[in-house]
Amino acid sequence: MSQSNMVPVANNGDNNNDNENNNNNNNNGGTDNTNAGNDSGDQDFDSGNTSSGNHGEGLGNNQAPRHKKKKYNRHTQLQISEMEAFFRECPHPDDKQRYDLSAQLGLDPVQIKFWFQNKRTQNKNQQERFENSELRNLNNHLRSENQRLREAIHQALCPKCGGQTAIGEMTFEEHHLRILNARLTEEIKQLSVTAEKISRLTGIPVRSHPRVSPPNPPPNFEFGMGSKGNVGNHSRETTGPADANTKPIIMELAFGAMEELLVMAQVAEPLWMGGFNGTSLALNLDEYEKTFRTGLGPRLGGFRTEASRETALVAMCPTGIVEMLMQENLWSTMFAGIVGRARTHEQIMADAAGNFNGNLQIMSAEYQVLSPLVTTRESYFVRYCKQQGEGLWAVVDISIDHLLPNINLKCRRRPSGCLIQEMHSGYSKVTWVEHVEVDDAGSYSIFEKLICTGQAFAANRWVGTLVRQCERISSILSTDFQSVDSGDHITLTNHGKMSMLKIAERIARTFFAGMTNATGSTIFSGVEGEDIRVMTMKSVNDPGKPPGVIICAATSFWLPAPPNTVFDFLREATHRHNWDVLCNGEMMHKIAEITNGIDKRNCASLLRHGHTSKSKMMIVQETSTDPTASFVLYAPVDMTSMDITLHGGGDPDFVVILPSGFAIFPDGTGKPGGKEGGSLLTISFQMLVESGPEARLSVSSVATTENLIRTTVRRIKDLFPCQTA
């Protein structure tokens, strides 16, 4: 029987029970022990010890005193069964229940009390031992499972490369790349299935992994004359679409480029560091080589690397930006100051819904610094667009000229593009990555510092242009035109303001087109150390231009003044008579101004001569600035046609314009913002020199144009002496 069923009993008046529990070896001490039990009963009850103390000293057998064993009153099986049955119903009996139970079982109420206490303690201990045992078994099982999984992880191999895949040995970038690689591999499998189906229908075999470059002719760029009279920096033979053997390579290259762009656009240090003079983030080439061990291949000898990243908020939704990037006419128009020409050669993949998700197309482009002194960069690449999630898009470019024979481009685009994330109120967060290799040694002149530091085509140049152009679009689409009114300004209706903004937009578009799309002879003449590019265009049946031969002359020069200072001076109407030959020394007045950007200097203005002048000419001026470039563009317009357009509801597209103006760049020596360093100016004039559809260019017309541009350059230089630097 367990100990819980044996309750220590003090002297309860039952001398027979006490005598039976005494030691039989001490016959003479029975009476004494019983009396001792009576004397110390209360003490023994508290301690649970029923021994009688030290009354055995006078024993007749002279033996040493012995401690007596504890006395227990063992309950009968019937008593235990009754109490256990009662315990199951009520483990905590009150005093009345204990008295009733004691009377029923012939026990003392105190015995009942202690039995229930012991029973509760016993049950509690048994439950705790059971729970501890279960937890111990579960813990051992989890330890064993954990050890098994650890061993499995350390022994696992990458199915792609066969290398170890221990998570503890991988960087975050590597882990992210492996996840992306698995997803892109699945896409390739799906596309391969589609390609096989097409192959069965057309009879043209498709190889998944061709190992040799196809004998494909080089692309046909169909660009006009390049800068400095050259014909570009590559062969211009005709080509057809990419053949069936090349397309799988191009697709796999585009998928890998997208994977790399996603990492490049999101990972910070140590992959990216502070850029030159605090401009866009610059790429850590050593870290790049560690992170991306494959891709476009090793860097080309003699090529210079330009890599940067910039992030900004843009006033356009992601789908609008994607559409602008995927259509070459919109792309070249949006980035007219950077992209001279663009062409889509072939669309390899297209989204059936028409939203550009998954579109893959082969393109070529000519990138330019607006100057006749800088050679253009030409690139042949594939552009891939993919939606990465809800409100998140990515567009990536990567050169594919190395897949084609007989082509020698000097600009190679590694994975470059942008990550576009939807924000609130129609805005987008754009992270732009620009990563190119270029061989442009010996083509710098005064632009050497700007180009060699990577600022000419840096990511902040692209982002700054995008932000500025989106501001312009928003202002045209808005009905709340922000005009600057004063006492001498004319009053314009909303139609008049809209017409004026459209004319200013045409001036900018035509100015850039005149710098890049002119065809015909290109002549260079040395004028005080500057080269002047003179080109001709013939205008026929263009309602926005006069018919005849139009000459476009351009040159670049340096000024020892910050870009902001030069921009603010040239845009002011009150300063124009100091440098504009067409003003004939007369003061110009601003009679209307409409802002088309956050910066109030981004605006369209209408200028005219003083009230005493008999001139019928007015000037529409477009001024635009961002941290990387500024423009002061203008065109003389007929006063009568402008009055009809602004007040009579005329079509602004029929106002005849020939734009001229200035492109202002930092010289690369100052900090961003245009408040330090010098300025690089490109001045361009467009003039009608011979009217009529059959007119031809004459030598005197060229001489007149050169003299005009030379005089303007000299006047501006005189206004900014060297001591202002």
Curated annotation (Swiss-Prot):
Gene Ontology MF: a single term: DNA-binding transcription factor activity, RNA polymerase II-specific
Region of interest (Disordered), residue spans: 1-74
Any coiled-coil regions, as ranges: 117-201
Disruption phenotype: In plants missing HDG3, HDG7, HDG11, PDF2 and ATML1, increased cell division leading to cell overproliferation.
Entry-linked CDD domains: homeodomain, START_ArGLABRA2_like
GO cellular component annotations of the record: nucleus
Biological processes annotated in GO: cell differentiation; cotyledon development
START domain: residues covered: 243-475
Assigned keywords, A-Z: Coiled coil, DNA-binding, Homeobox, Nucleus, Transcription, Transcription regulation
Signal sequence range: none
Skewed-composition ranges (Polar residues): 46-64
Subcellular location: Nucleus
InterPro entries xref list: GLABRA2/ANL2/PDF2/ATML1-like, HD, Homeobox_CS, Homeodomain-like_sf, START-like_dom_sf, START_lipid-bd_dom
Organs and tissues of expression: Expressed in siliques.
Biased composition annotated in UniProt, kind: Basic residues: 65-74
Segments of the chain annotated as binding DNA: 68-127
Similarity remark: Belongs to the HD-ZIP homeobox family. Class IV subfamily.
Free-text function comment from the UniProt entry: Probable transcription factor. Seems to promote cell differentiation.
Designated name of the protein: Homeobox-leucine zipper protein HDG3
Source organism per UniProt: Arabidopsis thaliana
